[in-house]
Amino acid sequence: MAPTEVLAEQHYNSLNPILEKYNIKTYLLTSSVKDRSEIINQMSSSKPVFFIGTHALIQKDVNFTNLGLAIIDEQQRFGVDQRKKLIESSNIIPHQIVMTATPIPRTTALAVYGDLDISVIDELPPGRKEIESILLSGSQRDNNIVIDYCNEHLKNNSQIFVVCPYIDESENKDIKAAEKVYEQYLKLFPDKKVRLLHGRMKSEEKESIMSKMNKAEIDILISTVVIEVGIDIQNATLMIIESAERFGLNQLHQLRGRVGRGSKKSQCIFHISNKLNIDKVTDVGKQRLNAIVSTNDGFKLSELDLKIRGEGKVTGTNQSGLSDLKIADLRYDFDILKLSKIFINKELTPELEEKIYGEATLLFPNFMKFMKGEDAS
């Protein structure tokens, strides 16, 4: 399951030729496919079948007879209940793999708590170079520097992404909007192919634009966060994130990852809104911007995000905010919890588990009341 049709189609096109060699049927299920009922009928097949899709996989009429493996890509884009729906859509509990470039705070907390085991790919693919991150203010001087970077990359026959938080101008005109920025870039680069992409466009129009970007028929693409996942343009070497203080840390990291996918040197500019500098940004916004330019490491960023946002309800569905833990604080107890998990995984037996629970009940008679948030007086 992937969060966007573009990404689901990309996975289908990659996996279908491989699985065909083993006589495994592969089906793509999204909201726009025409043979939906036929695909759903295949879910009761007794033969090995591979389904790739979007949220269409978790609709009410979708039921798997024998789901053995559930893979969720870009899992930070799905809510807790949505991930649960996929896993519970079969009469057996499937094996699960969740994939993300930046685990959200709740994921970090759950991984520490033992619900998830983590495998880390901490190396760049062969031939790729580290992306350089640059933080620029909204001053006129820095605005001109952004254009200088554009000229430099265009001279190298590279492509550029410019991402804005909104489609239209808001009441605060200093926050960059995609349509306004598109008009500006048309004037600044009249001899270049500048295009606009956003979520209000029809699917066919979006697909056409991305196809042209893929074929290097577009030089500069002005967009909203619709390109956050599933875009693989190897010739794109400059990402400009306008009004960067308006984005979450997770989004900033995902957007940065849209460049640096080829062998050319790539850069990502985090450009603050007009007339703003880092000192005028909110404390939380400042922490996010300083964090994103300090590292390209997704796991380090997730730990920083954990400190900024909190881990959310360990037993509920909130993925950020105050914890429901009464003693531990995963923002500060991360290392000791990590060591505890390693120890318990090695040493825990049913007898030891019973003994620990018994001791805890004696030492903390009001333990269950604490956990339920009841009055323990």
Tell me what each language-model feature is.
Residues 115-182:
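Conserved interdomain linker/interface between the two RecA-like ATPase lobes of SF2 helicase motors
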Residues 2-51, 55-56, 186, 191-197:
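Conserved nucleic-acid-binding Ia/Ib motif block in the N-terminal RecA-like helicase ATPase lobe
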Residues 25, 46-50, 66-69, 92-97, ...:
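Loop/turn-to-beta-strand initiation segments
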Residues 1, 29, 50-54, 71-72, ...:
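Structural recognition of the conserved hydrophobic beta-strand(s) that form the central parallel beta-sheet
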Residues 56-98:
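SF2 helicase catalytic motif II
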Residues 5-6, 26-35, 71, 76-77, ...:
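Flexible beta-alpha connector loops of hexameric P-loop NTPases
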Residues 141-159, 179-377:
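C-terminal helicase module of SF1/SF2 nucleic-acid helicases/translocases
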